Amino acid sequence: MTPNTDLNIPLFERAKALIPGGVNSPVRAFKAVGGTPRFVKRARGAYFWDANDQRFIDYIGSWGPMILGHGHPAVLEAVQQAALEGLSFGAPTERELELAEAILRLLPSMQMIRLVSSGTEAGMSAIRLARGATGRSKLIKFEGCYHGHADALLVKAGSGLATFGNATSAGVPAEVVQHTLVLEYNSIEQLERAFALHGKELACLIIEPIAGNMNLVRASVPFMRRCRELCSEYGALLVLDEVMTGFRVAPGGAQSLYARDIPGFQPDLTVLGKVIGGGMPLAAFGGSRALMEHLAPLGAVYQAGTLSGNPVATACGLATLRAIGQPGFFAALSARTRALVEGLRGAAAAEGVAFSADSEGGMFGFFLLPALPRNYAQVLQTDSARFNQLFHGLLERGIYIAPALYEAGFVSAAHSDEDIAATVAAAREVFKTLAKP
């Protein structure tokens, strides 16, 4: 493919004249890696085809929702039937209840749930609920964790532990983020000091239990245990952002994994998205009945949405949850993801490339580092130029990973053993070309 024949190039030029940066979400622009984004014409199973009709093995899967692969027959049938009945009503439907019941059966920490349309909306609403329920304003988040683009959560670390955060986006007033304290992920020392200084002012602590916006970094069990203990001790709410991990890493989300090692572990609030919508705009947040009844129309915490509980989106989500609930689904998905990660490790080792990787369920991450990082500062040690070489080398060979070194990857039920083998073979070819550090 040459610049004169690549149909993605004129599409991107056209897009840049119409849409800021040519995309409707920044990471899609390939700004971090350079080059031209692939414009998708269609997708099926583990693959998509771009404007040139070139096929790619897709490890983004719409950034996580497509756990069954693209165009799963049962999901398409459910969506088509729902669309025939009506696209949107702005009124309750029985399917909303069925989806709520399906989610609550899988997450014992949640007794009630509120459906919304995006992960950002769910995270923003959970923070508002935490503040309304506790009567407090301050919150803790962690470097490298992303909770959507709500103003209070677009924050980077201040100059010291006791310094509240600075906005990472223009247009966010300083007074909005002055209540947000940013700590190092996995640092029990910083966590304990923060609660000692501000514990009685904290409405909540929000965290990605497996941080997929640092590629993939796990909260250690001792760290998560201490988060739970300190929140309980000081009356702050523990909010788990499982937009990415919910029903992706295990049937009960990441919280079920921590509950195996921390007796009685449960968050106060959980934020969900991606998989629960199956590829449609749908997200949710939920918790105990006592907390959720602070929401309007029962309580004083206002939250609303024209398209919340959309009938087509709930049909898509319900069909997806039913499919992933089949016996053996997660065992097979986890095995295939592990096979990919182990294959990539072996390919890198064979070519002498520093490489580390991890996976859980259908989610994986890798680093061009000799050991897995534990926090954002360690993630930043990755050589971005080498990652860009790897990204473009794989892209040329028909393998599509995230066009940014800080994003996790996703395997679907549609990925075959042959897809995994082809990916590992392509990666080994690219590893040969990487300049040795």
Curated annotation (Swiss-Prot):
Chief site of localization: cytoplasm
Protein location: Cytoplasm
Q: Which PANTHER family match?
A: GLUTAMATE-1-SEMIALDEHYDE 2,1-AMINOMUTASE, GLUTAMATE-1-SEMIALDEHYDE 2,1-AMINOMUTASE 1, CHLOROPLASTIC-RELATED
For molecular function, the Gene Ontology terms on record are: glutamate-1-semialdehyde 2,1-aminomutase activity; pyridoxal phosphate binding; transaminase activity
Q: Which GO terms describe its cellular component?
A: cytoplasm
User: Is Cytoplasm one of the keywords UniProt gives this record?
Assistant: yes
- Does the keyword field hold Cytoplasm? yes
Which family is annotated? Belongs to the class-III pyridoxal-phosphate-dependent aminotransferase family. HemL subfamily.
Q: Which residues carry this modification: N6-(pyridoxal phosphate)lysine?
A: K274
In the record, biological process GO terms are: protoporphyrinogen IX biosynthetic process
Name the cystine pairs: none
Q: Which reaction does it catalyse?
A: (S)-4-amino-5-oxopentanoate = 5-aminolevulinate
Keywords attached to this Swiss-Prot or TrEMBL record, sorted alphabetically, are: Cytoplasm, Isomerase, Porphyrin biosynthesis, Pyridoxal phosphate
The Enzyme Commission number assigned here is 5.4.3.8
State the needed cofactors, names only.
pyridoxal 5'-phosphate
Q: Which InterPro entries match?
A: 4pyrrol_synth_GluAld_NH2Trfase (IPR004639), Aminotrans_3 (IPR005814), PyrdxlP-dep_Trfase (IPR015424), PyrdxlP-dep_Trfase_major (IPR015421), PyrdxlP-dep_Trfase_small (IPR015422)
> How does this chain assemble?
Homodimer.
Q: What is the lineage of its organism?
A: Bacteria, Pseudomonadati, Pseudomonadota, Betaproteobacteria, Burkholderiales
- Which named protein is this? Glutamate-1-semialdehyde 2,1-aminomutase
Query: Pathway of this protein?
Result: Porphyrin-containing compound metabolism; protoporphyrin-IX biosynthesis; 5-aminolevulinate from L-glutamyl-tRNA(Glu): step 2/2
